[in-house]
Amino acid sequence: LWGVDRIHQIHDAMRQMLLDVDKDAHFDAVLVCPHRHRDRCQCRKPMPGMLRLGEQLFRGEAPTQSQLVVEIDGGAKVNWWNDKIEPSHPLDAMIGDRDSDMGAGWAQGVRCFKVNWNLGLASVTERILDQKDKGDPFNPLR
């Protein structure tokens, strides 16, 4: 696991890359799961805890700063056997290059777009903006 200083270095580098492209670019938030895979926390993908926190931050009642540094309550449990839930907004999407990304998106009910790691977001931008595009199929039990 990386320490806090390394996480800040990575995010600072990402910020600079954005600013190099657009001087007005910024992050609205940076959310980090500090746990190891074996910790089985609610915030590490494929669990949707980070997505649920993001939704709370931007669409609900934002938690206080002190609440942000404690364990994330994953909210409703995920039933991988049920049908995918409905998203809060039709343009909500999870874009990623791993099945764990798709699992988190599926558990949150959002459209999922799996991309090649070296193509990234640019390869699906048009699809994301098309509300009729339901995303890529994903079976959480596979």
Where on the chain are the PLM-derived regions?
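Short, basic/glycine-rich phosphate-binding loops at helix/coil junctions
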Residues: 29-37
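Asp-based, Mg2+/Mn2+-dependent phosphohydrolase catalytic module
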Residues: 5-25, 38-142
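Short, solvent-exposed loop/turn segments at secondary-structure junctions
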Residues: 1-2
